[in-house]
Amino acid sequence: MSGHSKWATTKHKKAAIDAKRGKLFAKLIKNIEIAARQGGGDPDGNPALYDAIYKAKKASMPADNIKRAVARGSGAEAGGANYEEIIYEGYAPAGVGLIIECLTDNRNRAAADVRSTLGKGGGSLATNGAVSFNFERKGEIVVPSEGLDFDDLFEKAAEAGAEDVIDDGDTYTVVTAPSDLITVRQALQDAGVDYDSADLVMRPKNEIELGLDDARKVSKLIDNLDDLDDVQNIYSNWTASDDVLAQLDEE
């Protein structure tokens, strides 16, 4: 039930070092607005909103920004955009599969930007289902590993109904069935476990191991896609050796 996701470690470090604060906040605000629109503005009765707000607080978003995003999403305040959720499937270099989740108020712009960025990075759009068959929807709870015993977390997570616990170095990732995400998150909170985020994600069933050159191309393409205003999340099925990831981490 335990494993080690080396790319996740590099990804978390990279995000911590060079995260673009403005774009990060914009994505988090969209998450809050959508959650409030779909489930109401009370986080106590809207678990998705609770987790969106929690994630924003972890990123040090000012409380006033969060409050206004909730108000716009719930309709208590004017100004909320009418975001549409769109999922694109694509290929990066070396045949790596990508799932690109967008929240946009302009479908044509989102499609054009994603297509253009893929093309410039040596990738392409794929037909629906061509990539997603190799992914499955899961819940993920990211927990800081410092001061927390893996076996202790493993036991608590398993008792709460988690499917897996992965050691990513600086963090542990608790994997759940989509329908169990909130239950497991609440159980860990009740047990005094701090967490960074709780999200529904797409996890690859099979991964492609890349050498340095291809890993560099793929990570650059993913970074460029992530910079697009309409893109919320990107999931891929690539991995690499510790040596390759260490070199990427230094660049």
Curated annotation (Swiss-Prot):
The keyword Ligase does not apply. Gene3D superfamilies: 1.10.10.200, 3.30.70.980. It holds the Pfam family TACO1_YebC_N. Its main location: cytoplasm. GO terms for cellular component: cytosol. InterPro entries: Integrase-like_N, TACO1_YebC-like_2nd/3rd_dom, TACO1_YebC_N, Transcrip_reg_TACO1-like, Transcrip_reg_TACO1-like_dom3, YebC-like. This is Probable transcriptional regulatory protein BLA_1344. The keyword Transcription applies. HAMAP family: Transcrip_reg_TACO1. GO terms for biological process: regulation of DNA-templated transcription. It is found in: Cytoplasm. Keywords: Cytoplasm, DNA-binding, Transcription, Transcription regulation. It comes from Bifidobacterium animalis subsp. lactis (strain AD011). Belongs to the TACO1 family. GO terms for molecular function: DNA binding. NCBIfam families: PRK00110.1, PRK12378.1, YebC/PmpR family DNA-binding transcriptional regulator. SUPFAM superfamilies: YebC-like (SSF75625).
